[in-house]
Amino acid sequence: MHHLHPMIVCIFVMYTGIVGSDAIAGDQLLNIGVIQSKIRSLMYYTDGGASFIVVKLLPNLPPSNGTCNITSLDAYNVTLFKLLTPLIENLSKISTVTDTKTRQKRFAGVVVGLAALGVATAAQITAAVAIVKANANAAAINNLASSIQSTNKAVSDVIDASRTIATAVQAIQDHINGAIVNGITSASCRAHDALIGSILNLYLTELTTIFHNQITNPALTPLSIQALRILLGSTLPIVIESKLNTNLNTAELLSSGLLTGQIISISPMYMQMLIQINVPTFIMQPGAKVIDLIAISANHKLQEVVVQVPNRILEYANELQNYPANDCVVTPNSVCCRYNEGSPIPESQYQCLRGNLNSCTFTPIIGNFLKRFAFANGVLYANCKSLLCRCADPPHVVSQDDTQGISIIDIKRCSEMMLDTFSFRITSTFNATYVTDFSMINANIVHLSPLDLSNQINSINKSLKSAEDWIADSNFFANQARTAKTLYSLSAIALILSVITLVVVGLLIAYIIKLVSQIHQFRSLAATTMFHRENPAFFSKNNHGNIYGIS
């Protein structure tokens, strides 16, 4: 397996339904609610060589008697040219910018071309390289286009100078051959023109739908196989079966989505489109099986439980591995993967899948568990201890023994089954052996975190109760703190106001004292001045005699 890593794993459906295998004890697993839904074979595929399809967008009409003027064909030609002009210009720009001689210059030209187009993804760079290679073989492509221009076959093989096989598909030529050629000489020109116009209009509508992304986006947008199917019509299966050789049938290859196309060239002269298709090569690995498992709930001592098994397993050489296929493309008949996702499984699961039911691990289910029944291959599997299982034909209620995990109902037991509000038509007979010697009473019940809802709910309830208690305590302390803070704030404000009041009063008293002192000084000065005015002689004598000793 180590040298298969460049390949891609593809799982192709070989069997469907309940089919037993060597390593897995399918019949015994049914008793505990494990159902094998599909068994697939393992295949590898790698990229194959490129193939080319030439699509002719205009039909070849037989020459008329010279009196008919088919105007609808000219109108279709003009409309189609307008429709494809952006795509033609886009391809021409890529080819022109990237047309250099050396490999290094060519790669640089691709980058320049992508920059000019405003795109830069890895997929588009790869697509641009393909267009460059096609442009290098422009002469061969033109010869190929010219060689198919005169043919009326819907599918024809053309081999160019490099021996590249291309399939020329003229998608509407069959319609023209069947509807026009036989009656071109007998009906009126107007009728032929109208008929041709209606066919061309329908096909033009399909072309508009197919190339919408290419018209509104760069030409490097890939075509899906659905677009190719619409474009090529009924000729596509013929093309695939004759040219795209694989180990898969046409329907399987188309549904896998692995077949995609890309427009690499358009001939404006002939209105032909060259599409490149890469087809993978498939190799089957003998003896390998990939099995899908469905696990429904089962009854254990009147309690609903579910067994722990992988959703998909790989059986090879009598060994079992887990195979999730998370990165795979799933179709109704295949699962295609880029790598092998096989991984070991626990010993208990291995023994359980081998039929040792006492090694199986179950987890309890509390609440509404939806996987209580499964309908596979015309037989109904249900946990009738957790569901109301009522048969409508013949009318009766299906009872399930306490020691049984599930009930298996086939057409012998009931032809129309009612599960709660669901109605099922039973169409098949259950052929497997139902093992009755295993009792769910002795089952190994283990509480696992992924499905142990009861413990999870209890843990959540405890956490919620603890959170509520903490919130209550927090609110109490917050209220206490709020009250204490309010009292402290009021006391502080009162103290500050008191201090401010005392300061203001002190300042007022000091101001009053100073004012009174100034008033006394002013009065004393005024009295002295009055005495001086009233006794001038006294002051004159005093000054001469210096009675007060003032110099």
From Swiss-Prot:
Stretches in topological domain Extracellular = 24-492
Question: Where are the Cytoplasmic topological domains?
Answer: 514-551
Its placement in the membrane is given as:
Single-pass type I membrane protein; Single-pass membrane protein
- Modifications after synthesis and translation: The inactive precursor F0 is glycosylated and proteolytically cleaved into F1 and F2 to be functionally active. The cleavage is mediated by cellular proteases during the transport and maturation of the polypeptide.
Q: List the disulfide bonds.
A: 68-189, 328-337, 352-360, 384-389, 391-414
Keyword check for RNA-binding, yes or no: no
Sugar attachment sites: 65, 69, 77, 90, 431, 461
Provide the function of this protein. Class I viral fusion protein. Under the current model, the protein has at least 3 conformational states: pre-fusion native state, pre-hairpin intermediate state, and post-fusion hairpin state. During viral and plasma cell membrane fusion, the heptad repeat (HR) regions assume a trimer-of-hairpins structure, positioning the fusion peptide in close proximity to the C-terminal region of the ectodomain. The formation of this structure appears to drive apposition and subsequent fusion of viral and plasma cell membranes.
Which residues does UniProt call coiled coil? Answer: 132-160, 456-481
GO BP term, pick one: fusion of virus membrane with host plasma membrane
The protein's name is Fusion glycoprotein F0
Q: Which family does it belong to?
A: Belongs to the paramyxoviruses fusion glycoprotein family.
Q: What Gene3D superfamilies does the entry give?
A: 1.20.5.300, 6.10.10.110, Head and neck region of the ectodomain of NDV fusion glycoprotein (2.60.40.1690), Newcastle disease virus like domain (2.40.490.10)
Q: Where is this region: Fusion peptide?
A: 107-131
